[in-house]
């Protein structure tokens, strides 16, 4: 539900996908409360990225319309690979807290 609201907001603001890195915001949007996760939200879908420690847990708590992507290697490589595979040309990055 919260992700759907964020998607609607993205559409209003030009539909550029958003990379969320703050775990508090990820928990608020997805329910995931682990220590490693990244969320890419676009107007069409959401992609949750985490390592194998959290695969089963993440799949059990993230919304059904949020795809899980297994992080192999470092986080930057996983995020970069996901962005390239989706053909994303621009992305907003959450400001650090």
PLM feature spans:
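Terminal domain-start leader segments
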Residues: 1-49, 76-89
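Structural motif
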Residues: 21-23, 50-52, 72-73, 93-97
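Short, surface-exposed beta-strand-loop junctions and turns on beta-sheet-rich folds
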Residues: 35, 54-57
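A short, polar/proline- and glycine-enriched secondary-structure boundary/capping micro-motif
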Residues: 57-65
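Short acidic-hydrophobic, aromatic-tinged amphipathic segments that line or gate anion-handling sites
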Residues: 66-76
């Amino acid at each position: 539900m919260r992700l759907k609201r964020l998607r609607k907001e993205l559409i209003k603001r030009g539909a550029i996908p958003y990379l969320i890195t703050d775990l508090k915001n990820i928990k608020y949007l997805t329910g995931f409360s682990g220590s490693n996760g990244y969320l890419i939200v676009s107007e069409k879908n959401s992609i949750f990225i985490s390592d194998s420690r959290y695969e089963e847990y993440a799949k059990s708590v993230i919304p059904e319309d949020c795809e899980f992507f297994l992080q192999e290697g470092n986080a930057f490589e996983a995020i970069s690979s996901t962005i390239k595979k989706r053909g994303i040309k621009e992305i907003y990055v959450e400001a650090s807290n």
